[in-house]
Amino acid sequence: MTDNAPITFDGKRFAAHLSTAPGVYRMYAADDTLLYVGKAGALRKRVASYFNGTPKNTRLTAMLAQVVRMDVTITRNEAEALLLENQLIKSLTPRYNVLLRDDKSYPYVLLTREAWPRIALHRGPQIVPGRYFGPYPGVTAVRDMLNLIHKLFKLRSCEDSVFRNRSRPCLQYQIGRCSAPCVNVVTHDNYTEAVHRVTLFLEGKSDLLAEELIQAMQVASEHLEFEQAARLRDLLTSLRSMQNRQYVDGRAADLDVLACAALSGHACVLLLSFRDGRNLGTRMFFPKTNGEERTAEILSAFVSQYYAEYPPPPEILLDQEIPDHTLLEAAFSRSSAHKISLRWNVRGERAGYVELAVRNAQVALSTELTSQRAQRVRSEAVRQLLGLEGPIKRVECFDISHTMGEATVASCVVFDAVGPVRSQYRRYNITGITPGDDYAAMRQAIERRFRRAVEEDKQGERPDVLFIDGGAGQLAQAKMALNAVGVESVLLVGVSKGEERRAGHETLIMLDGQELHPGAASPALQFIQQVRDEAHRFAITGHRARRQKTRMTSKLEDIPGIGSRRRANLLKHFGGLAGVKAAGQTEIARVEGISTALAAKIYASLHGLSKNDAANASRVS
């Protein structure tokens, strides 16, 4: 037997020695790639079913042909196996499982736990002490909710650093969206009462909130506090108006509606969410499938993965029956504080919700496939233009952004054959170079990106084509960076706007000096423009954020004569750097520890003026 003889796996023999207990099984290829993760109520029976007879479809045939080993984990019950399966699928992303691809964390409403709580939109890890309400299907729903809360209940939204340093109410107070707890315009008792009402509102207890408002209004009237009674009356009117606008069905309470559409090997799962009877909108998911799963299987995989991460509502409506629905209900109910019900074949208004979700899923999938087809045509045009042998699987593009050398940021965006892969975008804060040296910035960014790929041996993350936003000089720097880390298999292409800098007149520059002029109507150039423009957008937004952060933290410290104490006095007096910048020299000089001369220096520095200009401004102010 030679060293390179194929490895065979005797699945029947492996299955015969397995336990009949519930658990999770994993299948691996020769290179240790994880092919598939599955759960079973009885491991021996489930695993044996793969190797008894002919596989039922080509996907299964292809997968089993690659299996060289398996391992299993026994669990106490099938529900525990389901949870472990979901965890492994999410963390290990097996090749042949249906994968929920969602590179965004869901937005929540955060109500902080402190003396004067603030309310805000929150994404990411829940490490800030407080209550988190959600998740919501999209950021628009959260912003609409927060706008309503600020209008009705006037809770603060400012960060603690701003809250602690204010000496007068901010603009939010002036426009009636905050009660100015920062300067004690509202009493602590009244603010706490507002927080309580917001909590009821976010918990979906609008009817209970309305009852409390009516009682409070009656008490205020009995005590002849007519202004307070009028405010409560207006709040109650606004609340009822909001209920009339937003409640689709008072009986709907908290529920999610899910529908799945599939076409040409692609799938879309649409989520329609209601909380407290309010329609919070829809969200579309396009899970990675292998093209042969039934929609019920796709929907089942989605339900198990999605609600393993996000808390399910008491009622989930489906457009069809799914496998393991009883097991899923039991698992979700066990991990939640309430019973979870999965329902299909519903009637009345709920049937209307399901029908709406089905139509939206079909439209979303059709739109996505049209977009993907157009993207594939453009990708193929790029392949032909550049003379590549195989299809393009991955392209990357780098761009540099700075303001006269300040806060330099490099971006790297990633596209595959069907569009952007935003979860793999990267930004690089550039340091240790001469300000404004774009060549050095490009070289540093590319070295950092590919050195990590080389060190971690991530061949799959290397692009077929690497576009550089720039001409021959930038292209040469990119080549030097790749040589420095030992990467040779990446095709480098410079994208130059040319002398006229007009869209559609870009020139593609190759390493050998060859220039390509695709023309404005070229599908290849349209693809390249999309990639280049996305890299530019991603670089600029990163640069602006870094520049703003730098300026907010260091602008005052850079002024001679301003130490930590004077800086604190200025920020406290004016409520932040923006307030200092908006003030005149005379007003700045009124701050403790700030002389007239120092005020002039501060004003000049913040406005980029010379001493003479500052003196003239002083006479005007």
From Swiss-Prot:
The UniProt record lists the keyword tRNA-binding: no
Domain spans labelled UVR: 207-242
A molecular-function term among this protein's GO annotations: DNA binding
Disulfide bonds: none
Protein name: UvrABC system protein C
Any one annotated GO CC term: cytoplasm
GO biological process: nucleotide-excision repair; SOS response
Lineage: Bacteria, Pseudomonadati, Pseudomonadota, Gammaproteobacteria, Lysobacterales
Domain GIY-YIG as annotated: residue spans: 20-98
Subcellular locations according to the entry: Cytoplasm
